[in-house]
Amino acid sequence: MAPKVFYISDGTAITAEVFGHAVLSQFPLEFESLTIPFVETLAKAEQVKRQINDCFITTGERPLVFHSIVKAEIRDIIYSSEGVDYDFLNTFVAPLEQHLGVSASPVVHRTHGKANHGYEARIDAINFAMDNDDGQTMKHMDQADLILLGVSRCGKTPSSLYLSMQFGIKAANYPFTEDDMDNLKLPEALKRNKKKLFGLTIDPVRLHEIRQSRMENSRYSSLKQCRLEVKEVEMMFKRERIPYIDTTNHSVEEIATKILDVTGLERHMF
């Protein structure tokens, strides 16, 4: 039976999930999880406590409980459950207060709430990424922090959206298609912003598999076409001295982190 995990918060529970996933990923196990956000009242906390206790009664195993709860009275109710508590927020606050010489002033929803200073940057960047996805328009390239290039289905769109959502980076992306292969070159709008260009490439066999799932047995998805496009685009990256990375078998989080590391782009938010 898969171990049971609860992610609980008086906010969005995103922080509890991220922390919990990071820790549990170190173990070669499958977990069954339940996320419970916005536990903002004593009544809701008691309800969650009953869920945790019922889980213990049903399985005979104490569930893991990762939580980031600001209000002490709500946190105490969760503490009194039959779960194994991992309160990472409170674990780090006291030592930091001692080190910084300043008392914390906890506020619910501060981390992922609208009042957070990075909220507007996040929304602007997300809108920019969607408006400038897949070469829809070349009018706003001057406003981009980053322009991702590559063949179709190499990871440009998810990387652009992740960079915008997670770091507030205005990322556009531009695809090189089958029609470009005979005379592959940078459009003028990209040449003007060459310092912002960053390439993504991918193993042709993996690209073939991805395209097959969308357009099976087509010229677009053929291994021959995938090999041709990847080869031509990589040659252009080298010719134009555009930095690039291989996205094969990497998660969007890993791709985004590598891009930031190579480019030195500053995160606009955390």
Curated annotation (Swiss-Prot):
One Pfam family here: Kinase-PPPase
Role, per record: Bifunctional serine/threonine kinase and phosphorylase involved in the regulation of the phosphoenolpyruvate synthase (PEPS) by catalyzing its phosphorylation/dephosphorylation.
Residues given in the record as ADP binding sites: G150, V151, S152, R153, C154, G155, K156, T157
Catalytic activity: [pyruvate, water dikinase] + ADP = [pyruvate, water dikinase]-phosphate + AMP + H(+); [pyruvate, water dikinase]-phosphate + phosphate + H(+) = [pyruvate, water dikinase] + diphosphate
Membrane-crossing segments per the record: none
Record organism: Shewanella sp. (strain W3-18-1)
Enzyme class, first EC level, given as a word: transferase
Keyword ATP-binding in annotation: no
Keywords: Kinase, Nucleotide-binding, Serine/threonine-protein kinase, Transferase
Name under which the protein is recorded: Putative phosphoenolpyruvate synthase regulatory protein
Domain of life: Bacteria
Xref: PANTHER family: PYRUVATE, PHOSPHATE DIKINASE REGULATORY PROTEIN 1, CHLOROPLASTIC
A GO molecular-function annotation: protein serine/threonine kinase activity
EC number(s) reported in the record: 2.7.11.33, 2.7.4.28
